[in-house]
């Protein structure tokens, strides 16, 4: 919708607070533009709703439930992520 003219295919976008509000809107827009969204949220139910909406726009999402204020949790969960092209630190 918002980023239709931007091609983000083969790019990975990490979005914190992706389950609600601005983070959610950014996640959907990035997915529409072709990015694979690495969505971080504290609640799995919010991530599941986001995943449904991203699939509606034919996007890809990697869901990660974690609290970014907990450094150990964040480090452990993101250790498997090899590349981040875009960061939305919400």
Which functions belong to the PLM regions below?
Residues 1-12:
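Flexible N-terminal pre-Rossmann segment of NAD(P)-dependent oxidoreductases
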Residues 30:
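Aromatic pocket-lining residues of Rossmann-like dinucleotide-binding sites
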Residues 35-49:
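Conserved glycine-rich Rossmann-like NAD(P)H-binding loop of the short-chain dehydrogenase/reductase
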Residues 16, 84-90:
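Rossmann-fold scaffold of SDR-type NAD(P)-dependent oxidoreductases
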Residues 12, 17-21:
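Conserved glycine-rich cofactor-binding loop
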Residues 45, 64-77:
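The beta1-alpha1 cofactor-binding region of Rossmann-like NAD(H)/NADP(H)-dependent oxidoreductases
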